Amino acid sequence: MSTYDEIEIEDMTFEPENQMFTYPCPCGDRFQIYLDDMFEGEKVAVCPSCSLMIDVVFDKEDLAEYYEEAGIHPPEPIAAAA
């Protein structure tokens, strides 16, 4: 599977009300990926309007702050890397 680009999680916009990260797509829409999907290992954000996809660069430990911002708990405890 080929992706359009590789984007750091810090460069994406987090929408706490949807628990979703977005990033502008060249088609005018936005790439989307859900926080829980990322927690489960998904690293590809998809644009709902075209066929483009991007790789999202993050560490699982990075997600804790976004769960806190959304006011929810992660599906399981996030352990710091040893």
Curated annotation (Swiss-Prot):
Primary location: cytoplasm
Binding positions (Fe cation): 25, 27, 47, 50
Pathway: Protein modification; peptidyl-diphthamide biosynthesis
Transmembrane segments: none
Gene Ontology CC annotation, any one: cytosol
UniProt miscellaneous comment: Present with 8400 molecules/cell in log phase SD medium.
PANTHER family in alphabetical order: DIPHTHAMIDE BIOSYNTHESIS PROTEIN 3, DPH3 HOMOLOG-RELATED
Domain notes for this protein: The DPH-type metal-binding (MB) domain can also bind zinc. However, iron is the physiological binding partner as zinc binding impairs the protein electron donor function.
Annotated protein name in UniProt: Diphthamide biosynthesis protein 3
Species whose genome carries this gene: Saccharomyces cerevisiae (strain ATCC 204508 / S288c)
Gene this protein is translated from: KTI11
